Amino acid sequence: MNPLRSIQHNITTPPISGGQPLDAVGPQAQQSHPKRISPSQLSQSAHQALERLSANAEHQRLASLVRNALQDGTFQFQSSNHTQVTYKASICLPADTDTVRTDHLINNELTVQARLNDQSEYDIVSAHLHGSSKAISFDVPSPPPAHGSASSVLSERTHLGMSSVLSQDAVDSSSLETPLVSSPDHSRPPSQPKPVHIGSVRRDSGSLVSDNPVVQALLSFVQADQAFPPQAASIAGVQLEMRSRRDIEQALEELKGAFTVEKAQLMSGGSSSERVDEDVNADIHIPLLLKAIERGAGAFGPGALIEIADGGQISAKAFLASCAPTITSNDDVLSEFINQKLKGDDDLQVRLGAQELLHVATKKEFQLGGLAGSIGVSSILGSAWELGASELLKNAIFGKNFSPSQYALQLAGIDSVPPFIIEAMDSFCVLVIIKGMKGELWSMKDLLPKALKAGAISSAMSFPNNVLQYAGFKSRVADLAANSITTEAAIFGAASGIPPEVKESEELMRAGLFQSMKDGVMAHPGEGMDTKETIERMTRHALDIAPGESTAVKSMGLAAIVGMIPLIASSKATGLVSEQILRIFRNAVFNPIEAIALNALALGGRVNVPGLFDSDNAKHARVAQTILARASQHMEAGDREISAEELHQMLAPRSEFLRHVGSAIVNGMNASFEAIPALVRKLGYGEAPLAERIPYQDLAVPDTSRQPAP
């Protein structure tokens, strides 16, 4: 007879209840098993296995009951055989307790089968709960097997034998176990999202506390007016997780689609009293989510409705509440209590749902394609021009051994032509990166004119700096000052595609917010509030955290600083490497600095250095913590308002140096670009820009004729 087959048979045999004692034979019988088993007698593998099984919703209750019984010392020795030992505890659950989604269990018998390992610690093999009408069980995966021993086969079979069974017959347990392949890597279902916040929970002076600030804020809210049940977190090793209850990225796309403003009623160019519908396709989801975090359901008007798949409509309030996180724990008493508390607070669910969506909406993604295109264009075309084509063309025009100072203007003009081509292509790549970060589709028809305009500006802005390369000042100080100014001008010219893009986003968002308030989608600012100032502030706060625009603005600040390095270090670097190497390096690294900066900043948002700068995740965690803390302080929804400035300070701190530098550059460049068109308009030609045609005065009285019925 194969001894291993005998062992395997015993593992897969259904557990024997306390009413059917086993004869104590074999190695386990020779051991002196304690009358009661406690957590300290379990192996580390047993604790880890229970934690893994607790991640499964169907096993949470049973795993929690096992932990509680171990902690309370209610498991008593029942029987043992040559492979395992059985302990039993009597469990009395209240009639309204939902045990793993089965019928209510009142009189219950909890048994565990354990095996003594080589370290004289107990590995839990399986656990079973027998009720008045149903039985629930699971097998626990075993720890790693020993080398080449019978226990290796034993471990493999118990690992493959994990089961979850609901049976109508609590007495005849012979059909309770159905093999189910499982492993630690599969303890979380593939469709289950990763936790947004996770923390350990323990009892301290009668209250529950956590090492995670957000989880601690959640616990504080729940126990602000009601204590946790004594069964909650009554044992060590309890963890609590806040998870998205739905596909947040898909929900965000649904929100964008529902609240994109396609047309806005603006003033016509000829008359301030006449209104015309103009295509804007304004994306307002970020300011809308910010306002929902600030004011909860009070952020919306009666027109804030979202169409669902069956053709019906739900309110924005209900939609955001459906995006609020759900709570899971290896202690299901704890998770059920918290979830029940959250379900009773609609305002809190709206704010938490908005925060979940805002976190995804402001996530910055690395844009490899645009970066590769920018570096490729700058390094290949730029190096080809500087290392070969430039000298050949100039020699062909002026002859060999010509005097650069004699033809300074002509040479500078020739050197200003390549930037038109190179920077136009580079600007195209930069605009593609910005569109990608915003999650928007782009077209050649839309981006090419903008890129060509940026190339022309870059060509013109590079001319002064090119002149100084051939005819500098005699004074070293004057020459350095002039080179610094013209170098910065050339840098700004090379990035001239960014400021108009940011300005366009700003104008469209303002128009979209205006129209959404007019249509009753977003709540009216209220009496005594300056609507123009309110909309401008909402737009500014939104763009300061929008993934495309905020990163683009910061990249301007970074480019202005980094772009000066070649000028400052050129004299020192020339003595170390050849001029050709320096030119190749400059074209590959410093010329495409905007594209590099955009992606570097996107990656930098993932880095968290406490006390120095926060990652994007840390900023949003602080927002969630504030929402929960405010709810703890004010149980009434109307008293929980978070000010716009307070929220903005959390997501876009004043300490963001690059944002301030970049904003100054972008605003200055846009003002200079607008100077000539503004002068032309004063002479009576041209149309006012979109921002000047928004009729804020129309919001003095809400336009009820365009609002759907509540």
UniProtKB/Swiss-Prot annotation:
Residues 1-36, 136-155, 173-207 are annotated as: Disordered. Residues 1-15 have a biased composition (Polar residues). Keywords: Hypersensitive response elicitation, Secreted, Virulence. InterPro entries: Plant_immune_effector (IPR053430). The keyword Nucleus does not apply. It is found in: Secreted. The keyword Secreted applies. GO terms for biological process: symbiont-mediated perturbation of host programmed cell death. GO terms for cellular component: extracellular region. Coiled coil: none annotated. Disulfide bonds: none annotated. Effector protein involved in non-host recognition and able to elicit hypersensitive response (HR). This is Effector protein AvrPphD. It comes from Pseudomonas savastanoi pv. phaseolicola. The gene is avrPphD.
